[in-house]
């Protein structure tokens, strides 16, 4: 009788696996096609962030992961979305999130839905900004709320983190900001989206709730090259 092998991921393991994949896609780009690499990075980091939120919610109470708590623990029933997990962590778990982070989580979910269920048009710079901001949030949340470090004595000790900082300047700036002063911001009104021209762009994330684009706001002139 042959050896039987079990493949198993708990919530945290599932989340960190996806985030590690996003990290590798950014830090070790190599000769990979940028369009495919960044699309996969957005998908995996969005998946990982949602599962990190659910894992934190599970630690409040496992039943809270289910959309209808009475359905716990049926795997055929729907679990909460990232929005739902965020709301329950605030109202039941007692956690606080900056407006900037709440906007990020919601915009990230919308972008992932566009990729997986419809169509997605973006630029390399926009995609890198999405991934950079999401990775910074994920690493901060995992350590602060779940006691998990992606880079440390018990995890990765190679030069991946240095490579990640060099590969994505948005990530580097976000990490520096979180380390220095946190990430609290006041809510801002929606602004004009430069892509669809609707007043529907979130001032914190730069994500448009109508067309899905994430606009990079800067005083410096840049050329945003499409894939």
Predicted regions and their residues:
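Long amphipathic alpha-helical segments
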Residues: 58-65, 125, 144-178, 224-225
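Charge-enriched, short contiguous segments at helix-coil
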Residues: 13, 36, 94-153
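Flexible secondary-structure boundary motifs
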Residues: 53, 57-105
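Short, surface-exposed loop/turn segments at secondary-structure junctions
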Residues: 31-39, 63-67, 124-125
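Short Cys/His-rich zinc-binding micro-motifs
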Residues: 190-202
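Short Cys/His-rich micro-motifs in 6-15 aa windows
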Residues: 200, 211-222
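Charged alpha-helical initiation segments
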Residues: 1-42, 153-191, 206, 213
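Short, hydrophobic, well-ordered secondary-structure elements
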Residues: 38-59
């Amino acid at each position: 009788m042959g050896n039987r092998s079990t493949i198993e991921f708990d919530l945290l393991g599932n989340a960190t696996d996806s985030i590690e994949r996003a990290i590798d896609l950014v830090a070790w780009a190599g000769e990979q096609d940028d369009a495919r690499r960044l699309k996969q990075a957005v998908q995996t980091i969005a998946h990982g962030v949602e599962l990190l939120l659910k894992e934190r919610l599970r630690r409040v109470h496992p039943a809270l992961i289910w959309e209808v708590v009475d359905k716990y623990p049926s795997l055929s029933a729907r679990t909460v979305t990232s929005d739902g997990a965020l709301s329950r962590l605030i109202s039941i778990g007692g956690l606080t999130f900056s407006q900037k982070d709440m906007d990020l989580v919601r915009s990230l979910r919308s972008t992932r839905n566009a990729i997986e269920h419809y169509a997605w048009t973006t630029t390399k710079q926009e995609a890198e900004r999405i991934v950079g901001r999401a990775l910074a949030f994920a690493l901060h949340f995992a350590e602060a709320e779940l006691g998990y470090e992606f880079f440390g004595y018990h995890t990765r000790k190679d030069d991946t983190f240095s490579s990640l900082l060099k590969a994505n300047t948005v990530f580097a700036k976000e990490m520096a900001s979180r380390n220095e002063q946190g990430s609290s911001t006041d809510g801002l009104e929606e602004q004009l989206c430069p892509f669809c021209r609707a007043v529907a762009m979130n001032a914190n994330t730069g994500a448009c709730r109508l067309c899905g684009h994430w606009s990079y706001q800067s005083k410096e002139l840049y050329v945003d090259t499409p894939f």
